């Protein structure tokens, strides 16, 4: 196994074709491990950060990618140097992971741990936004435990998903009776008042139009609540727009549009990877206060996935929200994997982090360490 580190955008650009060929052959791939996601993340958010993308080759062929970055904590937080997933600042992937070829995963895990042990510049490794059932990182965790240097596993969030049945009626039958009743009532109300139609964005020109409409819908809704949204950040809007436009020609993006009497009322970004449809961002506006366009849109998107006959799962991503729990019967734990270097400084910081977490759980204000805002790193879910 031959490891190499890519440290700049030029090197990342050169990996495009190999990366795209490896991903479908890897364990548990998602759209958030695509080359398009990582390249555009570095374009938009990478200024001032140090790329550390570990590339693993076997007999010249690409078999593994570990997209890491260097991050130095501020001096009042100890000034520690962290190795972390590359997209954990500015814009966080709902599901972060490594990319290992399914036939070489054990060798890739061993090569990754060998690299980390040889790389002496880090005080702590922090891998946020990890699905606990990740096959690739599960193999890494097993190998680390075998070597006597296990990762700490810290619960972070929940990701909710639907195992798609053969029919939409079967999906509804699996819900609680009260939920099913409310969904039918809300959908029936829209159908009686309006001509409700769900369509799929066609040409790439429509993607730009619908994407901007979604952004405005999200901003309007959250301004009405007097709360900020991720879409208030121009960099966030720029990143997602570049990512969608870059991925769209591959057929991995669907923008679902709900119109009421011909006027756009809701838009849902669906990302496709293999047999899984990921419902990412959505925006909507209710023509009347009693209309439930947002939930009806999500239900219609799930129905669209069932009727497509090519998906086995519809993933609502990270964020354990009530509206998701009503629609999704399954969930997975999202965790942070953490490991400290065997140094006095790392041990002192680890102790301070434990104290900070205990203070936070007791209701006392934190004093540095791990408990500050943004440390959870959960995926965006619905903005």
Regions found by a protein language model. Give the residues of each.
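Hydrophobic pocket-lining residues that define ligand/cofactor binding sites across diverse proteins
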Residues: 116, 247, 305
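Active-site/acyl-donor-binding loops of N-acyltransferases
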Residues: 1, 5, 9, 70, ...
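A gly/proline- and charged-residue-enriched helix-loop-helix capping module
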Residues: 86-121
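Conserved acetyl-CoA-binding loop-helix of GNAT-fold acetyltransferases
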Residues: 104-115, 290-302
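Hydrophobic, well-ordered secondary-structure elements that form the walls
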Residues: 262, 294, 298-301, 305, ...
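A conserved beta-strand-loop-helix scaffold within acyl/acetyltransferase catalytic domains
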Residues: 3-85, 127-290, 381-382
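A short, internal acetyl-CoA/4′-phosphopantetheine-binding micro-motif in the GNAT/acyltransferase core
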Residues: 94-105, 282-290, 320
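Conserved GNAT acetyl-CoA-binding A-motif
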Residues: 121-130, 305-318
């Amino acid at each position: 196994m031959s490891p190499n580190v890519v440290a700049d955008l030029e090197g990342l650009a050169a990996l495009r074709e190999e990366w795209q060929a490896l991903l479908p052959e890897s364990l548990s791939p998602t759209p958030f491990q695509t080359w398009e996601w990582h390249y555009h993340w570095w374009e938009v958010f990478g200024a001032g950060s140090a790329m550390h993308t570990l590339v693993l080759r076997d007999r010249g062929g690409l078999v593994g990618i570990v997209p890491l970055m260097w991050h130095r904590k501020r001096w009042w937080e100890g000034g520690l140097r962290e190795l972390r997933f590359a997209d954990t600042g500015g814009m966080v992937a709902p599901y972060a992971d490594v990319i290992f070829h399914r036939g070489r995963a054990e060798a890739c895990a061993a090569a990754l741990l060998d690299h980390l042990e040889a790389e002496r510049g880090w005080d702590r490794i922090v891998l946020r936004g990890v699905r606990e059932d990740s096959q690739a990182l599960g193999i890494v965790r097993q190998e680390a435990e075998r070597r006597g240097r296990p990762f700490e596993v810290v619960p972070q969030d929940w990701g909710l998903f639907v195992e798609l049945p053969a029919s939409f009626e079967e999906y509804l039958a699996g819900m609680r009776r009260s939920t099913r009743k409310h969904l039918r009532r809300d959908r029936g109300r829209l159908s009686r008042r309006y001509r409700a139609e769900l369509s799929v964005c066609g040409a790439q020109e429509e993607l730009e139009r619908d994407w901007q409409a979604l952004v405005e819908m999200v901003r309007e809704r959250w301004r009405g609540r007097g709360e900020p949204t991720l879409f208030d950040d121009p960099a966030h809007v720029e990143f997602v727009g570049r990512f969608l436009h870059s991925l769209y020609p591959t057929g991995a993006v669907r923008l679902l549009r709900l119109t009421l009497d011909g006027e756009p009322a809701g838009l849902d970004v669906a990302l496709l990877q293999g047999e899984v449809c990921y419902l990412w961002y959505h925006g909507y506006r209710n023509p009347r206060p009693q209309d439930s366009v947002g939930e009806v849109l999500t239900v219609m998107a799930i129905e669209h996935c069932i009727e497509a006959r090519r998906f086995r799962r519809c993933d609502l991503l990270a964020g354990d929200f009530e509206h998701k729990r009503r629609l999704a019967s399954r969930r997975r734990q999202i965790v942070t994997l953490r490991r400290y270097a065997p140094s006095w400084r790392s041990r002192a910081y680890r102790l301070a982090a434990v104290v900070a977490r205990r203070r936070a759980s007791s209701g006392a204000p934190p004093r540095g360490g791990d408990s500050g805002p943004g440390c959870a790193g959960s995926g965006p879910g619905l903005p």
